[in-house]
Amino acid sequence: STVFRQWKAKETHCRFLHGYGISFKVYFEGELDEKNWVWDFGGMKRAKTLIDGKQPKAWMDYMFDHTVIIAEDDPGMGGWETMNKLGVIQLRVIEATGAEKFSEYVYNKLNDFVHEETEGRVRVTKVKFMEHGKNAAYYSE
């Protein structure tokens, strides 16, 4: 689960911190390998390519497991940084927050990772972000 706020949504309750159990669904396309697979899902653990210096699963956990994700232009940034320094929260800062932006963020990170790991044989076609089973957003190029 992760917590975030959309500070620009000033007329809605989404401007406040709120959190969900979240999940992502990633769609791949590419040529089959010698095992007749487009992507070896178990291979994520053996990947040589890293995302921001971390194995893919470790990166996903780092970003989205018991974290507070804040937009880089959030006017309350000083307070978030103080809470992070005090060990009250695990702060993650990205360009913008929300289902749509999380889909885009993960798409870009994973597509770069997959492209490098497979030497261009596979690409991510879209990423679906889900909040608590009711809300979802897709990102694709």
What is the meaning of each model-derived region?
Residues S1-E141:
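Charge-rich, low-complexity N-terminal segments
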